Amino acid sequence: GQQPLCNDCFACARSLCICGDLVPQCHEGCQQCEKVDTGKPLYQCRSFEDYQCAN
């Protein structure tokens, strides 16, 4: 399958993507994203590799 991009994430940490989308999107280097059930669109990056997150 194709890897999603995280163009619409508004905040990222070393292991997390916080996205405004309903679909998990990972920044380049974040190979997999999985939703964390917190009531917010919070996604945890799995198989993390160093990436940059522009504001």
Curated annotation (Swiss-Prot):
Gene Ontology, cellular component aspect: extracellular region
Superkingdom of origin: Eukaryota
Regions that span the bilayer: none
Site residues (Reactive bond for trypsin), renumbered to this chain: 14-15
Record-linked InterPro entries: Bowman-Birk_prot_inh
GO MF annotations in UniProt: serine-type endopeptidase inhibitor activity
Distribution of this protein across tissues and organs: Expressed in bulb (at protein level).
Function: Serine protease inhibitor. Weakly inhibits trypsin (Ki = 167 nM). Does not inhibit bacterial subtilisin or mamallian chymotrypsin.
Assigned protein family: Belongs to the Bowman-Birk serine protease inhibitor family.
Protein name: Bowman-Birk type proteinase inhibitor B1
The species this protein was found in: Hyacinthus orientalis
Upper lineage: Eukaryota, Viridiplantae, Streptophyta, Embryophyta, Tracheophyta
